[in-house]
């Protein structure tokens, strides 16, 4: 794969965020003439502007200029920048190359890369896979759509002998030559439909993770997910499956308390799982996928087991917060689509008071109606999408409104019975009221803390 030229090339970087800043740094170090453009104002971007100017980049803020795009040698877009952006379309029509940050990095990375994508579980599997390799004595860069962008590994690749990256559909959309040695596709369910023409376009986007793999590469796929199986049809790499049942020939068989690795029909390793949270079905799938990828990247069984034993899950993912009057509070703010909510509800054996709402992503919330009827005691709705959700799940259980997170938590506590769980698992993005899902989760945790400290506790 031939690296792109950088010396004295005019490069436009679209989006001044963590990815855009890292991209600009990489290019400027290699002699490029970099302009960073962003629709946001200088005041809103704050310290990022200072950092970009310190690097020596030219800045165009508060909007995009067609002339800047049309005079570029090539354009690098940050994750999440839509392909429909007018100046981008004009540049592409003129034949100016447009690529994503990850694609640029792929042109320069020479060490093995494991890439993880899927609608749900990406961050958990990426983190756990990194832990497994580190516990096996490997020097590993972990990043991508989480943490440091892959371009940072291309910039300082000598610090690690391999990379593990989380990859979003947005990043795959702007990649042409990206070839991970190990590609993991966890699951595909409705998400980001406000961006894609239809669900099939989203499925195709996820399947691009396998596009450039060859016979000596490895694909780790969910054998029980119809859309994953469709997306991985006809790929050239060697397939390892998880979640496909006891007849698996090459892959992982998931039990209640362990994951068995099978090679050519023979069991070759067993990974035990002791944590109740990690024994949740979706986390057992995550462990199976991470284990297969780790082995393919050279991890040891001992290192994998040590990583699983020490892994306590990530923040805002079915995270236990507190108990008040025998009602147990869980923060699952990262659940930003209906499938993630379904998985969360299936974890609980008790009744759940569910907090749903936020900014709509174009998903069908009606798929939650049955599982809510089976698992929930009540639902508290909040945020911009609450009326759409109400129409979709009406008739399942009692529905209540809240104007704020604090009100939602108070209402949930009033509705819950002893032994119940109160679960923030919103099925929506957070951007109607919050900077991020983490900001929303922190608000929930703070509301629970105030409830615990205040006068609202019963009895």
Curated annotation (Swiss-Prot):
GN (gene name): murD
Domain of life: Bacteria
Organism this protein belongs to: Desulfosudis oleivorans (strain DSM 6200 / JCM 39069 / Hxd3) (Desulfococcus oleovorans)
Protein name listed in UniProt: UDP-N-acetylmuramoylalanine--D-glutamate ligase
Annotated localization: Cytoplasm
PANTHER family recorded: UDP-N-ACETYLMURAMOYLALANINE--D-GLUTAMATE LIGASE
Annotated positions binding ATP: 118-124
Any GO CC annotation of this UniProt entry: cytoplasm
Organismal lineage: Bacteria, Pseudomonadati, Thermodesulfobacteriota, Desulfobacteria, Desulfobacterales
Principal subcellular localisation of the protein: cytoplasm
Gene Ontology molecular-function annotations: ATP binding; UDP-N-acetylmuramoylalanine-D-glutamate ligase activity
Family as reported in the entry's similarity comment: Belongs to the MurCDEF family.
